[in-house]
């Protein structure tokens, strides 16, 4: 009989000193590729260098090494975020009027940048109130700082320094986990352990820690600020933490300590953990006692979730078992095989995460205005508009990224031999039905939604307003949306008897809340104009999905090009001699999808901007009369294309066009410059590569004549490179134009 040594109890999950630290590679551009490492012969080299520098798949086939590189890069990413955040806090500490704003947030505007007087640029320092001259900011940091209980600039300095120290730790961790103690592949594939730690640690303890900070620091400080106490008189955070009597003066249940908790008498704590709903009438933000309660509850939920998965003790869920048990009567093998995909293809994993995070970011955009989480956020219209726009764009990019990485997974990581009759295989087998149906939906939505507008424009031009679709003629009321609004407005009386208001004032039923004579929020009426533009949203979103999904489902093969998987993720055409096979690569679908994403988000932020100015934002007189910024013109004007052009784009562009010579002049220059960037993109998108190559050769001839020819031969951009440069400038130009248009407008009138 053979005697084996006992199995080691502890698995070895890291490798020590796998790769020595060396700066030599920094001096070799393209060290990761044999071809690129030789250096440039033509100008194509620099483009290929940019395209492949972060494409770890192309550097090596070793999944363990790729995983380590990605893991290490995550720490670098966190370091960059912390450095950026530190800069924001430092600006708040060094260059801002935060303390002045804190003492009078309704009259003083936030500013954290003062322009130096160089060649007249100090014109950008507008008067933001309280005798401070600077650029008005719309990031929402001031409101966030107030909500977290920051009362002076020293605290901002300390936080900024702390963030820099943490950034240094992250950079160290990135180096350490690649060069000193690199995790083995098994570590990255241990999904149950990862779920437990991320759920319980990051989300559970993170939320619990934030709830603790809110209860012990934010709530008392904000309670005193709301009562009008001077920020300089308010005790410092550590005093509240160390001296329970201070807290007990504001929240009497603190005097009882933990007794109510251990005697299950939790309702005693209802003075600082509330469930009120609606907004605080002093600040126009959510009740901070509601948000503290929320974070406590979320923390508990995630702590439970972090104990659900099976690791060393043989109890709990196994993700593989859950997936393989997931079969229905009509779904074949169900989710069998997906576990192997998600533990060996980081592109597949990333695609799912981007799709969910993108959707979540868009949900955040909609909640930031309908349930404004920070004090005085709702009445800072510039910040409201900026936060909505920012989160919509970010969400759009993340969703397109999801499709991009799903397609890369299909091309590089999908193994058809291991995926038989599971849901992924079944979707791929009936992809023609999916795409042709989706195409039909797009055509239907496009013709009908656009047709309603065309009808209205025609009737308007013919002087027949009674034949238009509008709230005053032929009504197309969004009855389902109105029903949802109504249900939510009156639900709390049945579902949450102690709540004083519904989750959001936008649902209806409640009164409006005004802060300092400005509307914070009120019930948002929906009518025919919203019904029309909603169907344009449906149309643009479905077309975006059509393009992206077709790119994923046909990434490996199609009737036109059965061997597409061999050509890779990006290729210009299927070789010479096969006409009509250009723009079919998975990369090209992402490229085209980006334009439709841009269409979709543009119409959403235009809808939001005009709707809020027309029906929500405005001032309120002593008699209680509300004057909206554009006087409620959305319902009538937004029913025609001409109305959108005349009463939204043209009417509201006057501020940015006339901004020269004022503190908003930077937006005028940006508006002009970003239009040029956008137009520049068309030069790449509508160009033929041969045209430029001919031009280049003529210019090279002239250089040769003068004996100043370069050693590196100039080359026209490849087709794919040209498209990449084109779409980048198209999006940059379009987004910066919109940014300048929105901010010049809302800072002037808001």
UniProtKB/Swiss-Prot annotation:
Main location: plastid
PROSITE patterns: PHOTOSYSTEM_I_PSAAB
Similarity field: Belongs to the PsaA/PsaB family.
Signal peptide: none
Sample GO molecular function, one term: oxidoreductase activity
Keywords assigned by UniProt, alphabetized: 4Fe-4S, Chlorophyll, Chloroplast, Chromophore, Electron transport, Iron, Iron-sulfur, Magnesium, Membrane, Metal-binding, Oxidoreductase, Photosynthesis, Photosystem I, Plastid, Thylakoid, Transmembrane, Transmembrane helix, Transport
Quaternary structure, from the entry: The PsaA/B heterodimer binds the P700 chlorophyll special pair and subsequent electron acceptors. PSI consists of a core antenna complex that captures photons, and an electron transfer chain that converts photonic excitation into a charge separation. The eukaryotic PSI reaction center is composed of at least 11 subunits.
Record-linked SUPFAM superfamilies: Photosystem I subunits PsaA/PsaB
Protein source organism: Angiopteris evecta (Mule's foot fern)
EC number: 1.97.1.12
Residues annotated to bind chlorophyll a: 683, 691
GO biological process, one term: photosynthesis
Name of the protein in its database record: Photosystem I P700 chlorophyll a apoprotein A1
Function noted in UniProt: PsaA and PsaB bind P700, the primary electron donor of photosystem I (PSI), as well as the electron acceptors A0, A1 and FX. PSI is a plastocyanin-ferredoxin oxidoreductase, converting photonic excitation into a charge separation, which transfers an electron from the donor P700 chlorophyll pair to the spectroscopically characterized acceptors A0, A1, FX, FA and FB in turn. Oxidized P700 is reduced on the lumenal side of the thylakoid membrane by plastocyanin.
Annotated localization: Plastid, Chloroplast thylakoid membrane
Database matches in InterPro entries: PSI_PsaA, PSI_PsaA/B, PSI_PsaA/B_CS, PSI_PsaA/B_sf
Topology in membrane: Multi-pass membrane protein
Binding site for phylloquinone: 692
Recorded catalytic activity of this chain's protein: reduced [plastocyanin] + hnu + oxidized [2Fe-2S]-[ferredoxin] = oxidized [plastocyanin] + reduced [2Fe-2S]-[ferredoxin]
HAMAP family cross-referenced by the UniProt entry: PSI_PsaA (MF_00458)
């Amino acid at each position: 009989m053979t005697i084996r040594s006992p199995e080691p109890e502890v698995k070895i999950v890291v490798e020590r000193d796998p790769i020595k630290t060396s700066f030599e590679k920094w001096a070799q551009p393209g060290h990761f590729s044999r071809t690129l490492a030789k250096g440039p012969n033509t100008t194509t080299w620099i483009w290929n260098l940019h395209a492949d520098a972060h494409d770890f798949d192309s550097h090596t086939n070793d999944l363990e090494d790729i995983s380590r590189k990605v893991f290490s890069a995550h720490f670098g990413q966190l370091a960059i975020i912390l450095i950026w955040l530190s800069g924001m806090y430092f600006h708040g500490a060094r260059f801002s009027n935060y303390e002045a704003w804190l003492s009078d947030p309704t009259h003083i505007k936030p500013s954290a940048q003062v322009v130096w007087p160089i060649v007249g640029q100090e014109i950008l320092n507008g008067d933001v109130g309280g005798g401070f001259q600077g650029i008005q900011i719309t990031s929402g940091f001031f409101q966030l700082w107030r909500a977290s209980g920051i009362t002076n600039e020293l605290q901002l300095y300390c936080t900024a320094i702390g963030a820099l120290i943490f950034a240094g730790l992250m950079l160290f961790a990135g180096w350490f986990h690649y060069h000193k103690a690199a995790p083995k592949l098994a570590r990255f594939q241990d999904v149950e352990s990862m779920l437990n730690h991320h759920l319980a640690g990051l989300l559970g303890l993170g939320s619990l820690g934030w709830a603790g900070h809110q209860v012990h620091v934010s709530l008392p400080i904000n309670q005193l600020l709301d009562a009008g106490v001077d920020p300089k008189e308010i005790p410092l955070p550590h005093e509240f933490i160390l001296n329970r009597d201070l807290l007990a003066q504001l929240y009497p249940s603190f005097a009882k300590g933990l007794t109510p908790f251990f005697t299950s008498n939790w309702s005693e704590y209802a003075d600082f953990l509330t469930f009120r709903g609606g907004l605080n009438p002093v600040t126009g933000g959510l009740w901070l006692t509601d948000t503290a309660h929320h974070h406590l509850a979320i923390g508990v939920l995630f702590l439970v979730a972090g104990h659900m998965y099976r690791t060393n003790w043989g109890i709990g869920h196994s993700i593989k078992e859950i997936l393989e048990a997931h079969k229905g009567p009509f779904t074949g093998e169900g989710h069998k095989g997906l576990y192997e995909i998600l533990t060996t293809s980081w592109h597949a994993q990333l695609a799912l995460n981007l799709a969910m995070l993108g959707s979540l970011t868009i949900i955040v955009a909609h909640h930031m205005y309908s349930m404004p989480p920070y004090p005085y956020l709702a009445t800072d219209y510039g910040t409201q508009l900026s936060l909505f726009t920012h989160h919509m764009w970010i969400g759009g990019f993340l969703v397109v990224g999801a499709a991009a990485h799903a397609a890369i997974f299909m091309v590089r990581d999908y193994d058809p031999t291991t995926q038989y009759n599971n849901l992924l295989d079944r979707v791929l087998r009936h992809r023609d039905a999916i795409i042709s149906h989706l195409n039909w939906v797009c055509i239907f939505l496009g013709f009908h939604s656009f047709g309603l507008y065309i009808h209205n424009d025609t009737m308007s031009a013919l002087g027949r307003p009674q034949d238009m679709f509008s709230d005053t003629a032929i009504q197309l009321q969004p009855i389902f949306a109105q029903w949802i609004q109504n249900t939510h407005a009156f639900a709390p009386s049945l579902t949450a008897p102690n709540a004083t208001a519904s989750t959001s004032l936008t649902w209806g039923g409640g009164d409006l809340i005004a802060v300092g004579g400005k509307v914070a929020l009120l019930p948002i009426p929906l009518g025919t104009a919203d019904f029309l533009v909603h169907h344009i949203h449906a149309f643009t979103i479905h077309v975006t999905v059509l393009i992206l999904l077709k790119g994923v489902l046909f990434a490996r093969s199609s009737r036109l090009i059965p061997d597409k998987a061999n050509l890779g993720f990006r290729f210009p055409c299927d070789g010479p001699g096969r006409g009509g096979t250009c723009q079919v690569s998975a990369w090209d679908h992402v490229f085209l999808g980006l334009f439709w994403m841009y269409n979709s988000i543009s119409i959403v932020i235009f809808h939001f901007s005009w709707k809020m100015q027309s029906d929500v934002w405005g001032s309120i007189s002593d008699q209680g009369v509300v004057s909206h910024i554009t006087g409620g013109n959305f319902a009538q004007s937004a029913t025609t294309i001409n109305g959108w052009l005349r009463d939204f784009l043209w009417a509201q562009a006057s501020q940015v066009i006339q901004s020269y010579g004022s503190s908003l002049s930077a937006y005028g220059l940006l508006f002009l410059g970003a239009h040029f960037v956008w137009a520049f993109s068309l030069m790449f998108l509508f160009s033929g590569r041969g045209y430029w190559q001919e031009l280049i050769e003529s210019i090279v001839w002239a250089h040769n004549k003068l004996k100043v020819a370069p050693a590196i031969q100039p080359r026209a951009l490849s087709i794919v490179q040209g498209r990449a440069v084109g779409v980048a400038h198209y999006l940059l130009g379009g987004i910066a134009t919109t940014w300048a248009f929105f901010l010049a407008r809302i800072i002037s009138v808001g």
